[in-house]
Amino acid sequence: MNAPDSRQRMITVGRLHGAFGVRGEVKLESFTDPLRSIARYQPWILRDARGIEHACEGVRVREGGKGLIATMPGIEDKDAADALRGTEVLVPRSALP
């Protein structure tokens, strides 16, 4: 994960809700329509509760359970996935249609 370019206008497209299983997958709430289109808008900028932002590329999204599940580079266990609970997913406005 890298630091984002703060000069771009960012749009919130989702939120992470903690671990799904024990392999580092993360429950994902998408604000896009259709819901799965959130995967097309990358890189994601992840903003935690303290307002700290990190860029994340190569995220894979699938349907699972009662919603979407994200697999993110560098998140490989339940503890790392749970640490992302409440994190907002943002993308540059320029990435949207």
Regions of interest found by a model, annotated:
Residues 1-97:
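Short Lys/Arg-rich amphipathic alpha-helical segments
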